[in-house]
């Protein structure tokens, strides 16, 4: 008999918080998940922390299942009033359950009609296209991974 892991046991709960309102344990869990995905899983031995997680206008969104963070993203305020979605990731054992789409729906409800951009890993371009994002610039390679800048067009 297989015992379900927390990531497969229940429907995760959606959370969001401004950087200043995050308790240290939650911030640690968000950063640990991102490091597990972007540094370890994707084999990118580059600095994951960029200083933007604690900016006053940074909003973190995450899904927790049984107290375990299973997916996260952050919303940044770039110069000129443009919002930027980034660091979107889901635990490997929680993928295929639509959690990334839940996070995107949550953050885009907050964004509303304001301009919004992101830099997608090329393999994730169709995922973001489902949320109204289109390519918006020259493709580039970051940390050895091809990326495409994307923007959301207002409806």
In which residue ranges do the predicted regions lie?
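Conserved acetyl-CoA-binding loop-helix of GNAT-fold acetyltransferases
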Residues: 90, 96-109
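Conserved beta-strand in the GNAT
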Residues: 62, 68-77, 82-89
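Short acidic/glycine-enriched loop/turn segments that link adjacent beta-strands
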Residues: 55, 79-81, 142-146
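Conserved active-site alpha-helix within GNAT-family acetyltransferase domains
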Residues: 122-146
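Short amphipathic alpha-helix that is part of the acyltransferase structural core
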Residues: 2-55, 60-68
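C-terminal binding/interaction regions
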Residues: 150
């Amino acid at each position: 008999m297989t015992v379900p892991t927390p990531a497969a046991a229940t429907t995760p709960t959606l959370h969001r918080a401004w950087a200043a309102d995050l308790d240290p344990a939650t911030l640690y869990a968000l950063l640990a998940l991102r490091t597990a995905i972007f540094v370890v899983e994707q084999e990118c031995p580059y600095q994951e922390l960029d200083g933007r997680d604690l900016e006053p206008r940074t909003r973190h969104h995450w899904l927790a299942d049984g107290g375990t963070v299973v997916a996260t993203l952050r919303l940044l305020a770039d110069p000129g009033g443009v919002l930027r979605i980034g660091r979107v990731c889901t635990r490997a054992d929680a993928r295929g359950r639509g959690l990334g789409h839940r996070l995107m729906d949550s953050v885009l409800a907050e964004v509303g009609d304001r301009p919004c951009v992101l830099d997608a890993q090329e393999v994730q371009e169709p995922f973001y296209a489902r949320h109204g994002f289109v390519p918006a610039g020259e493709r580039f390679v970051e940390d050895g991974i091809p990326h495409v800048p994307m923007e959301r067009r207002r409806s």
